[in-house]
Amino acid sequence: MLCQKEFNSKRIEKIITYLGTDYLLPVEEILNWNITSEQKLIGKYKSQKAETNYGGRTWIAWFTTELPFADGPYIFNGLPGLIVSIQDSNNEYSFNLIEVKKGGNIFDARTKTVKIDWKKYETLARSYFNDPYDVNSKIRMGKTVTFTGPNGVTMDISIKSKEMQNSILQDNNPIELNHKINYK
């Protein structure tokens, strides 16, 4: 789950890799935080509770003003301090601060990215689901596709594709429930 944040313009984009290409998907939902008076100690930081809705989920965050950052994990930001812990109300996703340390410059080697919207992302995801190993395009180019198991036996590509499809269906619990893809 990678994101690219531009704080001056308040622009946030998810980075999704599909068949070797990095796609930038804009996050356009505004986080409207409800800051409560509830406080607790998280690690060594005095933290305050806040709640918001994002992606069809309710999120409970704990932030601290003891650190000079107003940011958080993934797309989460906009509180008057650093988010040290955040989880959705169903306990399906959680992010927790492990450590704060001074680092060097962060360099991202991505040189070519393609900007897409959620509709295009859904098209790509469905395409991947329907042909997880991109077999059809390889066959059109005159290539053959085979899988060899750990025992050296060649495996049927349709069985491998079905296994991948089952895995996609089993793991189909995105952070953004409002963009969940119904693959059937």
Language-model regions, residue ranges each:
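Extended soluble regions of mature proteins
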Residues: 1-184
